[in-house]
Structure formats: structure tokens, C-alpha cells
Amino acid sequence: MILNTGARTDTAQYYSEWLLKRFAEGFVYTRNPLFPNKVTRYELSPDKIDAVLFCSKNYAPILPRLHEITDKYRTYFHYTITAYGRDIEPGVLDIGESMKTLVALSKLVGKQRVAWRYDPVLLTDQYTIERHMDTFAHMAEKLAPYIDRCIFSFVEMYKKLETNMPELVPISEADKERIAEGLGKIARRYGIYLQ
């Protein structure tokens, strides 16, 4: 079984102590979001878990004790760092702090177990294609020696997002092509596998 610790929330950032306790005790209860009365118990013993997948925007809270998991389980880490500031993501670290934390994570677990996520790509009057290219180039130069790959995607426009973020500029197919080509060119310059 592959255990995804970050599918519903940023567990590494907000619930590190809880997560470490679950691994120490060897089980976790999860509630089915579609059927709230259905609760399942999962055994977390290393012989039952093939790999643990982490997805986070901030691994700093768990780094000092991460070895409690990595010493026993195969792991892979997705680290999301984008161009966006607190105007878009209020709880996120600034880019410099996030990059330092990614480097520290990579030094602990090895670059082959760290993917940098630059997603989702969205456009506003402030977050233009040019700004994405500049920010991505800056980050790619610094992060290339510490990552296995970079994963990017485009924001999916759905009704709730359009309501909550009216400042979003729709991304045309031409914009997508331009962004993908630009990110690809930058990634190649720094030897980053981009997917």
C-alpha cells in the first residue's frame, strides 16, 4: 500500500506531532469524506506500507524528527513552492524560506526522493506569465541540485474558485503553450526533468 499523507491536508506542516504519533503507534483511523459514518483503520507497520508519499508546502515542522519515519519506510516528498505570496496563499512561507527548507529536506533524504511542485500555475494582473518565468528561473537555479524533478500544472477554473478569486485571468491555450515552453526551456537550462 502507498500511504499518501498529504491528500486531504498539509499533514507535515500542520499535524506533524499527530502524524509521528500515528507512525509510532502503528495505525491510523480515517473517515471517508463521502460517507462520514464509515471509518477505516489502517495498519502502518513497515511490512504493510510499500511507500509513504508526502505532499507539503512546509516541511520545517517535521524535519527534526523526520528520521523516525524515513528510517523505517520508503518515502517520497512533493514540495510545493510557487511564485505566490501571502496575497494568494496566506499561510505559506516566503520563497526564500521555502527553498532553504527544501534544501534541508533534500540533504536529509537525498535528492532522488524530492520533487518540487510548481503548481498550480494561475494568472492575475500581479502574477503574469513574465513573473512566473522570472520566479521559476530564480528557483530552478537554486533548487536544481536538490530535486529529482519538477511537476507543474495549470489551475483548473471551477465555479467556487471563480467566486473566491475574481482576480484570476483565464489561461488561454496560447498562454498554456507559452508557459509550458518557457518553463521547459528554463528546466533544460538547469538539467531539471519537468513533468
Each model region followed by its residue ranges:
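Conserved Radical SAM active-site core
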Residues: M1-I88, I95-K111
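Extended interaction regions within the primary functional domain
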Residues: T9-Q13, K142-D148, E167
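Generic detection of long, well-ordered alpha-helical segments
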Residues: T9-S16, I95, I129, M133, ...
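Short, charged low-complexity intrinsically disordered segments located at boundaries
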Residues: K48-L53, F136, P170-I171
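Catalytic beta/alpha-barrel core
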Residues: C55, S153, E173
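Surface-exposed cleft-lining segments at the edges of enzyme active sites
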Residues: Y84-V92, P120-E130, N164-S172
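Conserved C-terminal portion of the radical SAM core fold
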Residues: E97-T163, A180-Q195
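Substrate-binding surface in catalytic domains of secreted glycosidases
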Residues: V169-G184
